Curated annotation (Swiss-Prot):
SUPFAM superfamilies, A to Z: eEF-1beta-like
Record's keyword terms, sorted: Elongation factor, Protein biosynthesis
Organism for this UniProt entry: Caldivirga maquilingensis (strain ATCC 700844 / DSM 13496 / JCM 10307 / IC-167)
Function: Promotes the exchange of GDP for GTP in EF-1-alpha/GDP, thus allowing the regeneration of EF-1-alpha/GTP that could then be used to form the ternary complex EF-1-alpha/GTP/AAtRNA.
InterPro entries documented for this protein: eEF-1beta-like_sf, EF1B_bsu/dsu_GNE, Transl_elong_EF1B/ribsomal_bS6, Transl_elong_EF1B_B_arc
Protein's recorded name: Elongation factor 1-beta
Family note: Belongs to the EF-1-beta/EF-1-delta family.
Gene designation per UniProt: ef1b
GO molecular function: translation elongation factor activity
Length: 91
């Protein structure tokens, strides 16, 4: 069965965010329905970082990018959400 691989780029809503705590909150909100395969930090500047979230889901109407974005938008410390990349993959 094919799967969908997503990469989301999220930016914090404030400068003094605890990135390790934010990563745990993101994983806690998305999983188990949306398994997080990794979260990378990307330096933006002046100590501010973006987080790149890697998610792989089954290809199904039950799993949507709209739902992922809705979940992420409800996290207090997230100020911006961008679907940076997605593709269909087969294993």
């Amino acid at each position: 069965m094919a799967q969908i691989y997503y990469v989301y780029r999220v930016t914090p809503s404030r400068e003094d965010v605890d990135y390790e705590k934010l990563k745990q909150v993101i994983k806690g909100k998305l999983e188990p329905k949306y398994p997080v395969k990794g979260i990378e930090e990307e330096e933006i500047g002046f100590g501010i970082k973006a987080l790149k979230i890697h998610i792989v889901t089954p290809e199904s109407d039950e799993y949507t990018s709209d739902e992922i974005e809705n979940i992420l938008s409800q996290i207090e410390d997230i100020g911006g959400i961008e679907l940076e990349y997605f593709t269909r993959v087969s294993f």
